[in-house]
């Protein structure tokens, strides 16, 4: 009988923030990004700040846990944009991720290169970015990901079927109650209309207890200790298969600052979980190889892990956003015809 276990997945991304740019700058100022002002949109300053608060200490903690506990596992997805920034401004951060992958117990997942929602607007652009990301993972880490994760965990039936058609063995999604209804997120599922790919669902309640509520002093469960959280995971998982805890890497140190105790909490929880008989950690692929999907699950409309609506409304919720997206994608063919990689990017 397979041991029940936790699947830890962290998303690693840092966007390129556009600087303030008005209609009067059009045709005059062709520099859209800032890396020298120390303003909130200074991409270099932001990256270096988060590297110090989050990336370096979390990389060090994960490596320590991997060295301490042979059964510890974790899965990551790292965008191409993040790797570009790390190479330029903090190469040691990228080396830290390489050391994690070299342990053989950290799995890298596939995604879009630019943290893009292109799947919902341009299949060609989406597939171009996925391929670009795949090449980067091979060049940087020497691995070819076999499980797909879309930006913001955005998922629907069409994406699940696409992932199977491209040979992926699994795909991730938000385990949103209105979709699950009576079902539990603590099993593998089969994407609707597929036969050879697994769907892993985020347990959003327990994931978000760490990601969003950990340091909230108005939360009735504050403070969250490792022992309390261990009890909650035990109660939720019971005799089911897997607990999928999915969150941003920056949860540790940036969203939840070091002085909240987040790093100690995580270390203590990992140790207590492993020490309890019958518990395991799995990478995403190991979970897929270990357990059978419980049933097919249909998501006819798009679900994400963003905001309270768990949909695309954060990016497409008003007319201005919709028109901007329409206009950008209307230029796709013209831009591609230029062959100018700096423009295409």
Enumerate the predicted regions with their spans.
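Short, charged, surface-exposed secondary-structure boundary motifs
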Residues: 119-121, 179-187, 209-211, 293
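Short, solvent-exposed loop/turn segments at secondary-structure junctions
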Residues: 12-15, 80-84, 113-118, 153-156, ...
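Acidic, His- and aromatic-enriched active-site or binding-groove loops in soluble protein domains
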Residues: 93-110, 143, 164-201
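Short, well-structured secondary-structure segments
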Residues: 3-10, 14-122, 146-149, 169-174, ...
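Active-site and substrate-binding clefts of carbohydrate-active enzymes
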Residues: 2-54, 67, 187-197, 201-204, ...
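Catalytic domains of cell-wall/extracellular-matrix polysaccharide-remodeling enzymes
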Residues: 131-186, 251-269
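Generic structural signal for well-ordered alpha-helices
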Residues: 59-63, 94-98, 127-137, 160, ...
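CE4/NodB-like, metal-dependent polysaccharide N-deacetylase domain
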Residues: 123-152, 232-246
């Amino acid at each position: 009988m397979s041991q029940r276990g936790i699947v830890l997945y962290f998303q690693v991304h840092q966007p390129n923030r556009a600087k303030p740019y008005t209609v009067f700058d059009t045709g005059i100022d062709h520099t859209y990004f800032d890396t020298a002002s120390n303003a909130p949109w200074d991409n270099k300053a932001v990256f270096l700040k988060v590297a110090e608060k989050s990336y370096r200490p979390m990389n060090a903690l994960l490596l320590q846990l991997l060295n301490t506990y042979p059964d510890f596992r974790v899965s990551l997805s790292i965008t191409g944009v993040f790797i570009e920034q790390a190479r330029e401004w903090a190469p040691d951060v990228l080396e830290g991720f390489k050391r994690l992958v070299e342990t053989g117990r950290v799995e890298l997942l596939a995604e879009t290169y630019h943290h893009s929602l292109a799947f919902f607007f341009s299949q060609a652009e989406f597939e171009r970015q996925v391929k670009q990301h795949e090449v980067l993972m091979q060049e940087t880490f020497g691995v070819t990901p076999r499980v797909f994760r879309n930006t913001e965990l955005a998922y629907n039936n069409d994406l699940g079927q696409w992932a199977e058609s491209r040979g992926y063995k699994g795909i991730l999604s938000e385990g949103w109650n209105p979709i699950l209804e009576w079902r539990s997120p603590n099993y593998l599922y089969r994407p609707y209309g597929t036969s050879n790919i697994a769907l892993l669902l985020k347990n959003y309640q327990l994931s978000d207890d760490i990601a969003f509520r950990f340091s909230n002093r108005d939360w009735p469960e504050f403070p969250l200790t490792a022992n309390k959280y261990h009890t909650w995971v035990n109660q939720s998982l019971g005799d089911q298969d897997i607990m999928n805890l999915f969150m941003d890497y920056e949860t540790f140190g940036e969203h939840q600052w070091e002085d909240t105790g987040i790093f100690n909490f995580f270390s203590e929880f990992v140790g207590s979980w492993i020490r309890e008989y019958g518990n395991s950690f799995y990478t995403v692929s190991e979970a897929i190889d270990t357990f059978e999907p419980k049933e097919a699950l249909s998501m006819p409309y798009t679900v994400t892990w963003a905001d309270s609506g768990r949909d695309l409304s954060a990016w497409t919720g008003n007319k201005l956003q919709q028109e901007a997206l329409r206009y950008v994608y209307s230029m796709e063919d013209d831009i591609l015809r230029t062959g100018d990689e700096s423009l295409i990017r």
